[in-house]
């Protein structure tokens, strides 16, 4: 304990005085004045209140937070209400054994953690119909950008075609990553006939399923054209919707990415949330991030390890194909446990309930003579007019009101005083 104290607790007042004397200084303030430039040195009263105890600070913060009017968010766009099973919240989300181990430095020692991540990867491959998945990435935007860069490396072309109804935050990340690489992003409207000339010049095609308006397209013709012109096909797909729809791998996509947030991970004011990345065997040595693989130990027993690490920068440095080792292991494990908790049939029930509520809301709006968008979709309702919903946050776009339903949805009611704006 004595050694720990001397190494990890700061110097005492006596030691501070001795160090100042050795420097020929009389106080820490004098030391600061000699180091910090005058232009940024804080002088005089900082106008901060007196210090208080932790309990007093928490009490005041709770009082301030209580002034907020909390509304249910139905904005969607990759962020949805979800129910975290109490057993996962207590034993994983709130358990330091899970949440402090943010990345497996000595991975093979932690076989339990690797098994949980292996379970997550298996979930992703079963959902997407693609054979290889990594152990998560930072968010959907990052995963989409990594998919773009993987596709870019397979061709000498410079153009990527992107669904114009992609989530805006994902498009922003794509633009940020594309600019320094000289990649040109060309937005396309999937509701119009694609220009074959555009496809022939592009190295990749990114489609959001469902899109920003909640529409669920089946771009079979576009995918066939992309295949002919050797244009890689990337799907950004909602995993809960994927439970009910044909796996994107079977549709013909080469890469699938998306956010696992709605698999039991709280919205958390926008994050953090685990993103998934799945692809074909052809690109398994180009896939970004960590991959957990199954092997055998020295006694021949099944053992898990981090696989294909020659892709990563701590092995190959400048020749690495993966320069992103940080993952969202805690949130990936939560979503994997969420799927195990509910099972395949439970996930289908949740997804079908969301779809059923969407259909009920559409019917109710039409009964009230409200113009609605009846395009095929999963969880999003789009109707004409701008309605004020007292207890909900929704989207308004070009004269339309847009809201997305989720696992927490039970019944949506317009109050009698809801008004057109």
Residue ranges, per PLM feature:
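Charged, compositionally biased N-terminal leader segments and the immediate start
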Residues: 1-11
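N-terminal entrance/gating region of PLP-dependent enzymes' catalytic architecture
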Residues: 37-119, 315
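Gly-rich Lys/Arg/Thr-decorated short loops/hinges at beta-loop-alpha junctions or inter-strand turns
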Residues: 96-107, 125-129, 155, 202-204, ...
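Short loop-beta-helix segment that forms the pyridoxal 5′-phosphate
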Residues: 105-109, 113, 121, 125-145
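Conserved PLP-enzyme active-site core in the AAT-like
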Residues: 142-145, 149-301
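Active-site C-terminal subdomain of aminotransferase-like
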Residues: 263-368, 373-375
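Conserved PLP-binding catalytic core of the aspartate aminotransferase-like
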Residues: 366-390, 405-408
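Conserved small/polar residues in nucleotide/adenosyl-binding loops
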Residues: 414-421
